[in-house]
A protein has these predicted regions:
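Short cytosolic helices in intracellular loops of multi-pass membrane proteins
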Residues: 143-147
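ABC ATP-binding cassette signature C-motif
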Residues: 1-142
Length: 147
């Protein structure tokens, strides 16, 4: 119904009256074409859909982002846009990804294994160095235990 709203609606918008403008700006910066709110999501390409979702996350005002495979469906330009957004993001982020290029840009890698959750300082390259050193130390300890 036009012109009517509930008190809860106003509470949700408190401090976010410019959300439409901020989202429109984010869409332009992400090189998304203008589209209306009534356009069905399935009519967007995979890359457009991912960028639109990411724009929403970045303008949400959240303190922390939880992103699952955020580079999926993005072309090179879209991935570069995302890398820039993450570099300038002031909040925290937990990102699940298999994208090595994205992981090399992260300041910390957290590995989830069947038995543990392990945190490694540094990007993906540093993570690989640390894992290799751990594996070599484990092999040496095993050889020492056997002899």
């Amino acid at each position: 119904e036009q012109g009517q709203g509930l008190a809860d609606d106003f509470d949700l918008l408190d401090g976010h009256w410019d959300l439409t403008d901020r989202l429109s700006l984010a869409f332009r910066e992400a090189d998304l074409p203008p589209f209306s709110a009534d356009r069905p999501a399935f009519s967007l390409s995979g890359g457009e859909r991912m960028k639109a979702l990411l724009c929403g996350a970045f303008v949400s005002g959240a303190d922390y982002l939880l992103l699952d495979e955020p580079t999926n469906h993005l072309d090179r330009q879209g991935r570069e846009w995302l890398y820039h957004q993450l570099e300038s993001w002031q909040g925290g982020a937990l990102i699940a990804s298999h994208d090595r290029e994205l992981l090399t840009r992260m300041p910390r890698i957290i590995e989830l294994t069947p038995t543990a959750l392990r945190s490694y300082g540094g990007n993906y390259d540093e993570y690989q160095r640390q894992r290799m050193a751990e594996q070599q130390a484990a092999r040496a300890a095993l050889e020492h235990a056997v002899t």
